[in-house]
C-alpha cells in the first residue's frame, strides 16, 4: 500500500491548520475524468507540444539566488521534467540528462516519488497527476531557499504554484483539476494550488564546467543536457516527521512555516487564486505567459 495519499491528506490537514494558526498569530485529473481524450498516437514525445502546447513554466527566486547558473539550473531542469513527465505520465518528456541525474523511485519515505508516477506505475491513479486533456495556462515555480556548498551538497525549498492552470472540459470550457492532493472540485482554501518541495542535490565530483551561461532564452525547454553531472538525491513534498526510522529533515513546524511562506509569496492574492480554482472558465481566463527565464534556443 502506498502511504503517500494517506499521509498527504493527513499532513495536508494538519499543516493547513498550522498555517491558519501562523496567520492568526503573525498540479491529476480525478480518476474518472470525462474530458476529451487525445489519442496517444497524436502526441509526439516533445515537451510543450500536444496536450501541454499551451502551458508554460515561469520561475522566480529569493534575492541572491541566480536562476541562470547551477545549482538553480539543475533545480529548474528537475522540476520542469517532473511536471511534464507527470502530466504526460511518460518518461519520454523528461529533459536530456534526467534519467542519469535522478534515481528511480524507492521504497523509503524520502524517495517514494522522487520521480513522477507514469503509465505502468501501480499508484498513478491515486498519487499521480496525469492529464488526458489539454492543459493551459501558466505554472509558476519559486526557489524559496537554497543552502549548502559544493562539498556537502545543496538543499533547495521550492514553491510550486499551479493554480493558474486548467484542463479542457467536453463543453470547451476550462477548470482547475484539483491535483496534488486530489480534492473535491471547487475546493478553495489558502493552500489550494500551492505545493512545496524540499530537494537535495549533489555536485559532480570532480567538478565539471557549468552549462554554457546564461541558461536563459526563448525556448520553453532545453535541447541539451543541462544537469551537468549533478545528482538529485531526495525530493520531499511532505513533512519528514511522518517517516519513522528516517532522518527528520523537514519537521512539521518547519514544513508549516514554509507552506505559509509559499502561500504569502504567491503572485496572486487569495481571491484571485480562488477565482482560478473554482467554477468553469473561458480559455482567456488562463493566459499562457512566456517561459521565464526559458532556455537557449537550439543553435544559440
Residue ranges of predicted features:
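C-terminal motif of bacterial Sec signal peptides marking the signal peptidase cleavage site
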Residues: 23-26
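Bacterial N-terminal signal peptides that target proteins for export
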Residues: 2-17
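Low-complexity, intrinsically disordered terminal/linker segments enriched in charged
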Residues: 188-300
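Bacterial signal peptide processing site
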Residues: 28-31
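Core segments of small alpha/beta cavity-forming domains
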Residues: 38-134
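Structured, amphipathic secondary-structure segments that form assembly/contact surfaces
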Residues: 91-194, 202-204, 209-213
Amino acid at each position: 500500500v502506498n502511504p503517500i495519499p494517506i499521509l498527504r491528506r493527513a499532513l495536508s490537514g494538519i499543516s493547513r491548520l498550522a498555517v491558519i494558526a501562523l496567520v492568526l498569530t503573525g498540479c491529476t485529473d480525478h480518476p474518472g475524468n470525462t474530458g476529451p481524450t487525445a489519442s496517444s498516437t497524436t502526441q509526439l514525445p516533445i515537451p510543450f507540444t500536444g496536450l501541454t502546447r499551451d502551458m508554460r513554466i515561469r520561475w522566480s527566486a529569493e534575492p541572491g539566488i541566480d536562476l541562470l547558473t547551477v545549482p538553480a539550473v539543475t533545480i529548474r531542469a528537475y522540476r520542469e521534467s517532473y511536471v511534464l513527465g507527470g502530466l504526460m505520465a511518460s518518461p519520454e518528456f523528461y529533459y536530456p540528462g534526467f534519467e542519469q541525474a535522478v534515481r528511480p523511485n524507492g521504497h523509503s519515505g524520502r524517495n517514494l516519488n522522487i520521480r513522477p508516477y507514469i503509465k505502468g506505475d501501480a499508484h498513478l491513479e491515486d498519487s499521480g497527476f496525469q492529464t488526458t486533456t489539454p492543459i493551459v495556462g501558466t505554472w509558476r515555480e519559486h526557489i524559496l531557499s537554497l543552502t549548502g556548498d559544493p562539498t556537502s551538497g545543496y538543499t533547495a525549498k521550492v514553491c510550486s504554484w499551479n493554480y493558474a492552470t486548467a484542463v479542457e472540459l467536453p463543453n470547451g470550457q476550462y477548470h482547475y483539476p484539483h491535483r496534488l492532493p486530489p480534492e473535491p472540485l471547487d475546493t478553495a482554501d489558502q493552500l489550494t494550488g500551492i505545493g512545496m518541495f524540499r530537494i537535495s542535490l549533489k555536485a559532480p565530483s570532480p567538478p565539471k564546467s557549468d552549462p554554457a551561461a546564461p541558461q536563459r532564452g526563448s525556448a520553453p525547454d532545453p535541447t541539451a543536457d543541462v544537469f551537468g553531472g549533478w545528482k538529485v538525491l531526495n525530493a520531499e513534498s511532505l513533512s519528514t516527521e511522518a517517516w519513522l526510522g528516517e532522518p527528520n529533515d523537514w519537521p512539521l513546524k518547519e514544513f508549516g512555516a514554509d507552506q505559509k511562506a509559499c502561500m504569502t509569496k504567491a503572485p496572486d492574492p487569495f481571491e484571485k487564486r480562488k477565482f482560478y480554482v473554482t467554477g468553469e472558465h473561458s480559455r482567456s481566463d488562463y493566459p499562457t505567459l512566456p517561459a521565464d527565464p526559458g532556455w537557449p534556443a537550439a543553435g544559440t
